[in-house]
Swiss-Prot record:
This is Phosphatidylglycerol--prolipoprotein diacylglyceryl transferase. Belongs to the Lgt family. PANTHER family: PHOSPHATIDYLGLYCEROL--PROLIPOPROTEIN DIACYLGLYCERYL TRANSFERASE (PTHR30589:SF0), PROLIPOPROTEIN DIACYLGLYCERYL TRANSFERASE (PTHR30589). It comes from the Bacteria. GO terms for molecular function: phosphatidylglycerol-prolipoprotein diacylglyceryl transferase activity. It comes from Clostridioides difficile (strain 630) (Peptoclostridium difficile). GO terms for biological process: lipoprotein biosynthetic process. The gene is lgt. Pathway: Protein modification; lipoprotein biosynthesis (diacylglyceryl transfer). Keywords: Cell membrane, Membrane, Transferase, Transmembrane, Transmembrane helix. It is found in: Cell membrane.
Length: 248
């Protein structure tokens, strides 16, 4: 499939970028709508999006380049070439969450409440963005005989982009359904991190283009940390909420 959607003023506009932009815009609109429901200023959500999205993209690229340094050390000019892909979601999440945290501290806003609001549309944005990997012919798995395998370079392989897209969409539905009944501030983002990490850990094991640190697949390492951290955060925040209720 052609990676180029169309050409504008002599510049090729890539499907990868279009799908990512659509996901980000939709995710931001969902967050703004959720902000109205929970009493958060829409301007603050928009400001966080304006800050966190570019910071997240830069961090996603840095993460990808660092763990592909053997290639980029020989091709320095490609470090700033975003158009062909090469963004790591874990780097983007870390950068985006950190940017949002700093903003809430400066503005004296409840970080966990804001995080629950902003993260709601994130898995849907990811589900859409993963189709950019399909168009680029990347982020696929190894050979398979399963009927839903896709052909890449004459070999039928696991469509891991599809597995993750479906998983991400499922997470979005889960968050959408239970957010109104959450037990504590931060439960939505903790649930997102935990569920995404579980799915990514297993899906990553099928991929053939994993970012490596020695013998370790970095996405699996980060995902394992995400699961453990999510469980610890859930226990801590649940206990903290119960203590606050008791004191009241």
């Amino acid at each position: 499939m052609d990676r180029v959607a169309f050409t504008l003023f002599g510049i090729d506009i890539m499907w990868y970028g279009i799908l990512m932009a659509c996901g980000m815009i939709l995710g931001t609109l969902i967050a703004i709508k959720e902000a109205k429901r929970v009493g958060i200023k829409e301007d603050d959500v928009l400001n966080i999006a304006i800050i966190a999205i570019p910071v997240g993209l830069i961090c996603a690229r840095i993460y990808y380049v660092v763990f592909n340094w053997s290639y980029y050390a020989q091709n320095m000019s490609q470090i700033f070439n975003f158009r062909g892909g090469g963004l790591a979601i874990h780097g983007g999440l870390i950068g985006g969450i950190l940017a949002g945290y700093i903003y809430t501290k400066i503005k004296n806003i409840n970080f966990l409440k804001m995080a629950d609001t902003v993260i709601l549309g994130m898995p849907l944005a990811q589900a859409i963005g993963r189709w950019g990997n399909f168009i680029n012919g990347e982020a696929h798995g190894g050979a398979t005989n399963l009927p839903w395998g896709i052909m890449v370079d004459g070999v039928k392989v696991h469509p891991t982009f599809l597995y993750e897209s479906i998983w991400d969409f499922g997470i979005f539905i889960v968050l959408l359904l239970f957010r109104k009944n959450k037990k504590y501030e931060g439960q939505v983002i903790v649930t997102y991190i935990t569920l995404y990490s579980i799915g990514r850990f297993f899906i990553e094991g099928l991929r053939t283009d994993s970012l490596m640190l020695g013998p370790l697949r970095m996405a699996q390492v980060i995902s394992l940390i995400g699961v453990i951290g999510g469980i610890i955060a859930h226990v801590y925040l649940s206990k903290k909420n119960k203590n606050n209720i008791s004191e009241e």
